[in-house]
Amino acid sequence: MNAVDPCHSPPVAPTASHSAGQPDASLARRELCREDLARGSLRDAYLKSDLADLAWSDARLQHSLDHTLGTARGRRKQAGNNTFTGSADIWIFAYGSLIWNPIFPIAEKRVARIYGLHRSFCLWSRLGRGTRENPGLVLGLDDGGACSGLALRMDAAHQAEELLLLWRREMVTGAYTPTWVKARTAQGAVDAIAFVMNQHSHAYAGRLPEAQIVENIRQAAGINGRCSEYLAQTSAGLATHGIADAGLKRLAALCGCGA
């Protein structure tokens, strides 16, 4: 977990001073924190905006979580391995903000690489890093290529509470599909949950021209801060762990937020 919790006040809810039910991005410049997730403030921000119909309930989140864990049990059973009972540690593959703001307690961290998916600014952000009128872009895993990031181990003792909070964060509108991936590390491969872009989501941006990506990242801001800050933090987080991403580094330079 980060040494300094970025939580000082709840995400800003919409007020009468801005248009179309959108939160005023100028009122908040801080990252999401655990307290926001524990008290449901992120979902509340959606419910108080004109994006309310997109917010998932805890029941729907729990169903998605149960399905994801059930998929893991099924895979192990087919392989003749019945050791996954819900009491095993779980790995999460981090490729964006989970690298520099994981929020949940991390028992172990490894540099990891997955294949068949790549890091892409393919997810519109109309609340956290932008607005409906001026949407930001954040990262998703899209089809093809490979991606280096971090495998983060969550120990079994924390899973009952922390996995639901993780789902409240990543699956607040169902923009991702939680997917088990093979994360290859120097210490061996591990099965990890990755939040892969849901290409059927309202928020899927697809493959955009670089110029448009740069424009949106440079201009957009939302309740969790500027989109350019998200890019800068991700670029710095990767560099801290010795992970090279030439495409991300180029975007950071073009957006004026490179190291």
Where are these regions (language model features)?
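A glycine-rich, hydrophobic/aromatic-adjacent loop/helix-cap motif
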Residues: 2-259
